[in-house]
Regions:
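Positively charged n-region of N-terminal signal peptides that target proteins for export
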Residues: 1-5
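Local beta-strand N-terminus motif with an aromatic residue
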Residues: 89-90, 114-115, 241-242, 266, ...
């Protein structure tokens, strides 16, 4: 963990270095509805921005191509979140991997908002095209936008600590950290065998982060699945307990390993699923089992969409941002550096507060 990479320095400086001056202010997360892709906007107390992924291009499918940014579904939804947050640029864009539902929206978004720096796992494996058609085109378009800003390739273990804020890369390009972080809990009794990934080329290469803001922790692993996801939890937990876990791969069936929930033990899990994309029945079952173990294990699960997948055990409607595809509400999380946080459903206006653990 010796290397200090530029984007983490920017993130740490923009959030950590201002934490004392911004006492009492929150680190805000907007989980934008991109129909089962990802776009998570993080806004520091002083208004700096980190965006994790940009959703789909165009009309919002894997077959869509970039077009008029004024008509771009996901870029416009991200733009709406930035306006709600009162910000007008993206300081750092982290692209977890190069599938269209994570990297496709960058062309149109870059025409709506300036993007200063880019972080990703490097380049796409040409074999990725054999499993998810269009991946090479998505990467080529992304790389053309990336070339206009600063670029950093993320590597596991790279980090920088500053004034209580910590950003650690825990996975990238198919590799993970090999040594436990400070709060890791050791041997994981829930380990069995790794679930096979639905995609063997890009998803397991996802950039994953453990972000901390004072005592608050948030884990985002992109679409990390298969052996790399398993390696973070088994045979030993390498990360430790987290406050909020954005469930890997939109809660797809290959992210349902109960060993990960045992290792990460989130207070709150968030599913960035769509109506049919992500939100697999095995993951719902694993989350329900964890929540039934008591609030000390998993207090709540919040969903971006009600799932219509066969066997999906949706959680309470009050914890779901969109009940169908006619709306595009987000979930907003506001974290304090004492470890407390709140989640707001923008559809209902309901806010639930989670006190210091």
């Amino acid at each position: 963990m010796r290397t200090i990479w530029y984007a983490v320095f920017v993130i740490s400086a923009m959030i950590g270095a201002h934490s004392l001056r911004s006492a009492g202010k929150t680190l805000d997360f907007y989980f934008v509805d991109v129909e089962g892709g990802q776009a998570t906007l993080i806004v520091s107390p002083d208004g700096r921005t980190l965006l994790i992924d940009t959703g789909f291009p165009g009309s919002g499918t894997f077959q869509s191509t970039p077009g008029d940014p004024r008509a771009a579904r996901d870029a416009q939804r991200i733009l709406a979140a930035t306006r709600s947050a009162g910000v007008a640029r993206i300081d750092t864009l982290v692209t977890t991997h190069f599938h269209a539902d994570h990297a496709g929206g960058v062309v149109e978004l870059s025409q709506l908002l300036p993007i200063a720096s880019f972080v990703d796992h490097g380049a796409v494996n040409p074999e990725a095209e054999t499993n998810v058609k269009g991946t090479l085109d998505v990467f080529a378009r992304y790389a053309a936008v990336r070339a206009k800003g600063r670029h950093t390739t993320a590597r596991p273990g790279e980090r920088l600590e500053a004034d209580g804020f910590d950003a650690v890369v825990v996975s990238s390009d198919g590799r993970t950290i090999s040594r436990p972080l400070a709060k890791a809990t050791g041997r994981n009794p829930a380990c069995a065998a790794a679930l096979p990934p639905q995609d063997i080329y890009e998803n397991p290469r996802s950039v994953g982060f453990l972000l901390s803001f004072g005592r608050f922790t948030f884990l985002d692993l992109g679409d990390l699945t298969g052996a790399p996801l398993f390696a973070l939890a088994c045979p030993d937990d390498l990360l430790g307990h987290v406050d909020v876990y954005l469930v890997a791969h939109h809660g797809g069936p290959d992210a349902a390993d109960p060993a990960t929930l045992s290792a990460f033990t989130p207070r709150v899990a968030i599913l960035n699923n769509g109506r049919t994309k992500g939100g697999g029945a095995p993951t719902f079952s694993a989350l329900h089992r964890a929540s039934e173990a008591g609030p000390s294990q998993l207090a709540d699960v919040w969903q971006l969409h009600r799932s219509s997948n066969q066997g999906a055990q949706n959680f309470d409607d009050g914890r779901i941002a969109n009940l169908d595809e006619s709306t595009a509400h987000w979930l907003k999380l506001s974290a304090s550096d004492d470890g407390s946080f709140s989640v707001t459903n923008s559809r209902t206006g309901e806010t639930k507060t989670y006190p210091v653990r």
